[in-house]
């Protein structure tokens, strides 16, 4: 009974109940004039015999005493303030971290960002990004908002996502980067934006193809097919030229880039399918050479 009464007195003096799941600690010796928790004061209290319920006070093996020693080791007078933490913050840090994943609201925002990028909704994309929605979050197929925007050719959304930290080299479930998808469409500005944002032209998909390989495949299709109209073919060739120009610019191959500029000028002057085919053949040879140089560099 006396022990129980003593325990009750301890609880009343500490102002806290053991039912809170926290140790009762006398506030006066443990807080400074500013109400800050001090490990130094806590260690002194332990050394002075102020024990914790259910623990041996002042024991040499006390985890709290060991923590106190580590905290004070090699401390200099100017570091005194570093040894003080607000008591409330210390209690919060001691609690288990309960956030195991995004909340339902956050999941909805992530999905909405991808859907908005896919729907070319620039205003909603910007709003969600400014609210802190993660631009790198992917769906169950590994596709991010940047994958959707690159595939759709929306250069404005692509730039917005890159400005807010989207990874231009993030792969989807098939290993495609946004540049792989952009290389399969007719949107040269997106390719330029991705390359300037750090996209790698030598990134491999799961089939071992780079965006340059996809460009070469498109050129082969253009050389074999005759069903597309002249303007569509010209647009395809222009896109591939633009991608190669940015690639060579990043590598510092200015002489080769000038050759591409000449091809682009010739393309603009074409008026017949035969002239476009001639430029396409030259570009195919140039692309093959670029791929060979790329493979040599990897070795």
Curated annotation (Swiss-Prot):
GO terms for cellular component: cytoplasm; midbody; nucleus. The keyword Cell membrane does not apply. A motif (Nuclear localization signal (NLS)) lies at residues 98-116. ANK repeats lie at residues 108-137, 141-170, 174-203, 207-239. SMART domains: ANK. Gene3D superfamilies: Ankyrin repeat-containing domain. InterPro entries: Ankyrin_rpt, Ankyrin_rpt-contain_sf. GO terms for molecular function: protein kinase regulator activity; protein-containing complex binding. Coiled coil: none annotated. Keywords: Acetylation, ANK repeat, Cytoplasm, Nucleus, Phosphoprotein, Repeat. A motif (Nuclear export signal (NES)) lies at residues 282-292. Interacts (via ankyrin repeat region) with LYN (via SH3-domain) in an activation-independent status of LYN. Forms a multiprotein complex with LYN and HCLS1. Interacts with TSN2, VAV1, DBNL and LASP1. This is Ankyrin repeat domain-containing protein 54. It comes from Bos taurus.
